Design a protein with these regions (language model features):
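N-terminal secretory signal peptides that target proteins for export/translocation
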Residues: 1-12
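Bacterial N-terminal signal peptides
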Residues: 14-28
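N-terminal leader/targeting segments and the immediate start of mature chains
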Residues: 27-70, 220-229
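Gly/Pro-enriched, hydrophobic low-complexity segments
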Residues: 35, 115, 139-229
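N-terminal mature ectodomain segment of secretory-pathway/periplasmic proteins
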Residues: 45-101
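Short hydrophobic/aromatic-rich beta-strand segments that constitute the beta-sheet cores
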Residues: 54, 85-88, 104-107, 160, ...
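An acidic-aromatic
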Residues: 76-128, 198
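Short, solvent-exposed helix-to-loop capping segments enriched in aromatics
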Residues: 125-139
Length: 229
């Protein structure tokens, strides 16, 4: 049975608490010559809600001379600006992460355990600001140093480094590709100070869908242990 960190999410999900978030949603069409920063700006400006499926590969550094270990999970994601999102992990373990605008909830079905944090304190300068919170590119640049990187894997890339270096997050790389509907935010790569690397790829993307309010509501299941931080 997996254990929950005393002060946070399960180890495999620590990057998601730092980010929680993360998504890849199609953007309105942008010129073919547009760079990664242009695509990011269009995403923030024009995408108010979205949903997608995702696969997450978390690579942890090896210990005592052992090679690195990689664990893969998949699930679904939805978000609505400002400040609401939901991750539902299906395999190999069921977990739910919900930000309702006030509280960040993590439910581990295997442990029947809920962790609740004040959302403003839990997110801060994290990937969630890019996906669900920041109103414009200038707001992001107050918290991140944003630089374009060379194309890789058929995608345009941006590197985002938090200006506040007091957390676990080291940097975020965001990859865009050109799809049938224009630029798509396709990949999110996150590195932390423990040497852990998380790569999320997205599929079955829907842009600006009408999402029910219940998507971003969470009620702890009966009998669940609740930890509040």
């Amino acid at each position: 049975m997996r254990r929950l960190h005393a002060r946070g999410l399960p180890r495999g999900f620590s990057l998601l608490s730092s980010f929680c978030l993360a998504a890849a949603l199609a953007l309105p069409a942008v010129p073919a010559w547009a760079g990664g920063l242009d695509s990011l700006e269009q995403f923030i400006k024009n995408t108010r809600s979205g949903k997608a499926d995702f696969t997450q590969a978390v690579t942890m550094p090896g210990k005592d001379g052992q090679p690195p270990r990689t664990k893969t999970q998949d699930g679904s994601f939805a978000f609505e600006r400002p400040g609401k999102f939901r991750f539902d992990y299906r395999k190999p373990f069921a977990q739910t992460i919900v930000a309702d605008g006030q509280t960040l909830w993590l439910y581990d079905a295997d442990l029947n355990q809920v962790t609740a944090r004040q959302q403003a304190q839990a997110l801060g300068s994290t990937p969630a600001a890019i996906i669900a919170a920041a109103p414009d590119l200038k707001a992001l640049e107050r918290d991140f140093t944003l630089t374009e990187e060379p194309d890789r894997d058929g995608q345009q890339w941006i590197n985002a480094e938090p200006k506040a270096r007091d957390g676990q997050l080291q940097n975020i790389r965001i990859g865009f590709r050109t799809g049938a509907r224009g630029a798509e935010l396709a990949t999110l790569e996150i590195a932390d100070s423990f040497g852990q690397h998380s790569a999320l790829t997205f599929s079955h993307i829907e842009v600006n869908p009408s999402l029910p309010a219940a998507s971003f509501e969470f009620k702890p299941p009966a009998g669940a242990d609740i930890l509040r931080e």
